[in-house]
Amino acid sequence: MVEALTNRLREERAARGWTQAELADRAGVSRKTINTVENGVFVPSTILALRLARVLERPVEALFALADAAA
């Protein structure tokens, strides 16, 4: 069994009316980083996940979760 990380980053960002660039600026990362995390291309470090949770004022587990994926 392979575990994949799912995220609600796009939904939480959109709920605030923020662009990827706005979230990136608030989190101190590039827009490309936000894009790759939202699209599941890049798994964020613990520090980045916690920083995003702080910026979005959500618990980290509300943004990221493990999901089973077919091996």
Regions inferred by a protein language model and the residue ranges of each:
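DNA major-groove recognition helix of helix-turn-helix/homeodomain DNA-binding modules
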Residues: 47-62
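Alpha-helical residues within the helix-turn-helix
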Residues: 14, 25, 54
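Short alpha-helical DNA-recognition segment
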Residues: 17-35
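Residue-level signal for the short linker/turn that defines the boundary of a DNA-recognition helix
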Residues: 7, 17-18, 44-47
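A short, Lys/Arg-rich alpha-helix, primarily the initiator
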Residues: 1-15
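Short, charged recognition helix plus adjacent turn
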Residues: 64-71
